[in-house]
């Protein structure tokens, strides 16, 4: 099998690190709409990321943009996530350009 052209340029001294990233779109519903002036958030995440990783990415975003707003943190930690109208677990593996919805708890009276 023939080596790709780029392989001949790599030596022990030159280590090429390729990070495979994919895009995930988080659709915002209910109280999570306060996270942005848009209807969604977009993040670049590593391949093979899970909902748990996305939840942490959202928490990092909130910390950076809203100084760790405690109410927003509670919303993220207690929210469900869904894909294709199905509730998904924190272990669910995300695919590239997948749309995920965050579904905050709903209170009423």
Residue ranges of model-derived segments:
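Ubiquitin-like/PB1-type beta-grasp interaction modules and other compact soluble beta-rich domains
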Residues: 2-6, 12-108
């Amino acid at each position: 099998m023939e080596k790709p052209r780029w392989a001949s340029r790599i030596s022990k001294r030159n280590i090429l690190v390729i990070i495979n990233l994919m895009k995930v779109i988080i659709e915002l519903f209910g109280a999570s709409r306060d996270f942005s002036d848009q209807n969604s958030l977009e993040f670049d995440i590593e391949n093979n990321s899970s909902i748990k990783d996305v939840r942490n990415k959202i928490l990092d975003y909130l910390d950076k943009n809203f100084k760790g707003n405690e109410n927003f943190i509670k919303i993220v930690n207690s929210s469900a996530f869904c894909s294709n109208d199905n509730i998904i677990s924190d272990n669910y593996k995300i695919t590239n350009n997948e749309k995920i919805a965050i579904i905050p708890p709903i209170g009423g009276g």
